[in-house]
């Protein structure tokens, strides 16, 4: 079809929601596109280029049908995928990749809670105490070999770096951001305790906005409004000419 001779229609430009490509003005997704050409030859060349890159409507329908047949388009697993997950993960016990052989030195790789599990233990970081200690332990357990707990040379102890808090947060920590914003904008200036700081209300009552009625009526170029006149060039009077640029 010669686009320069195409008959303009009442349709407008829009994106094709099926393919995501700017499909132009069209009657439906299965018909040939009728283009509106307000831009002449240059617009027609760009339009032809887009048409060459746009899939045939039949191809787009085939792709869409295949996608709908192979996917339920839901944000969760299909029945087949659910069965695969259950057979390979949920029904197979503990994931083997998350376990490591027990280190008799007492240094686990990652242990979230103390104790042994089938001769294996989790990780080098221990978050809760057991019979052994990790390299980084966040809560206490027994120090020494697991099987000689009563004969250990050292008593049970807490970790060297303990994560604690005093339970009494600072007032600034528990103050909501909304109230902090209120204090900054409309609260009294005493809250800031800095000289020269005004609240929003105090600033508006101290520095009243000036109103200049008919600002460009003055012929004096030294007046303040004259500096913002479109026909003022910084000379002794106004000129009815505009800037060259």
Swiss-Prot record:
Q: What is the superkingdom listed in this entry's lineage? A: Viruses
Any one of the GO CC terms: host cell nucleus
According to its UniProt record, how is this protein modified after translation? Cleaved by the viral protease during virion maturation. May cause the middle segment to be shed from the capsid.
Pro-segment residues?
116-167
Give TM segment ranges: none
The record's InterPro entries line, in alphabetical order, gives: Adeno_PVIII (IPR000646)
Q: Which GO terms describe its molecular function?
A: hexon binding
Which signals induce this protein?
A: Expressed in the late phase of the viral replicative cycle.
* Record site feature (Cleavage), residues: 115-116, 167-168
Q: Per UniProt, which keywords does this protein have?
A: Capsid protein, Host nucleus, Late protein, Phosphoprotein, Virion
Q: Which HAMAP family match?
A: ADV_CAP8
The miscellaneous remark of the record is: All late proteins expressed from the major late promoter are produced by alternative splicing and alternative polyadenylation of the same gene giving rise to non-overlapping ORFs. A leader sequence is present in the N-terminus of all these mRNAs and is recognized by the viral shutoff protein to provide expression although conventional translation via ribosome scanning from the cap has been shut off in the host cell.
Q: Give the multimer and partner information.
A: Interacts with the peripentonal hexons as well as the hexons in the facets. Part of a complex composed of the core-capsid bridging protein, the endosome lysis protein VI and the hexon-linking protein VIII; these interactions bridge the virus core to the capsid.
Membership in a protein family:
Belongs to the adenoviridae hexon-linking protein family.
* Name of the protein described by the UniProt record: Pre-hexon-linking protein VIII
Q: Which organism is it from?
A: Fowl adenovirus A serotype 1 (strain CELO / Phelps)
């Amino acid at each position: 079809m010669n686009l320069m001779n195409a008959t303009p229609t009442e349709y407008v430009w829009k994106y094709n929601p099926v393919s995501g490509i700017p499909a132009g003005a069209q009657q439906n997704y299965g018909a040939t596109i009728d283009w509106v050409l307000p831009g002449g030859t240059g617009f027609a060349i760009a339009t032809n280029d887009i048409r060459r890159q746009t899939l045939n409507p039949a191809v787009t329908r085939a792709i869409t049908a295949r996608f709908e047949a192979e996917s339920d388009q839901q944000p969760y697993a299909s029945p087949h995928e659910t069965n695969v997950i259950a057979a390979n993960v949920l029904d197979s016990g503990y994931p083997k990749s998350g376990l490591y052989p027990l280190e008799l030195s007492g240094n686990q790789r990652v242990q979230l809670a103390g104790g042994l599990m089938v001769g294996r233990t989790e990780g080098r970081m221990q978050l809760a105490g057991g019979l052994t200690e990790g390299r980084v332990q966040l809560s206490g357990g027994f120090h020494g070999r697991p099987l000689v707990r009563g004969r250990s040379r050292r008593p049970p102890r807490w970790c060297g770096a303990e994560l604690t808090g005093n339970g009494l947060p600072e007032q600034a920590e528990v103050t909501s951001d909304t109230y902090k914003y209120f204090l900054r904008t409309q609260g009294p200036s005493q809250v800031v305790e800095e000289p020269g700081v005004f609240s929003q209300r105090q600033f508006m009552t101290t520095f009243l906005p000036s109103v200049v009625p008919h600002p460009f009526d003055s012929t004096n170029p030294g007046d303040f409004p004259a500096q913002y006149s479109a026909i003022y060039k910084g000379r002794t009077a106004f000129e009815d000419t505009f800037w060259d640029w």
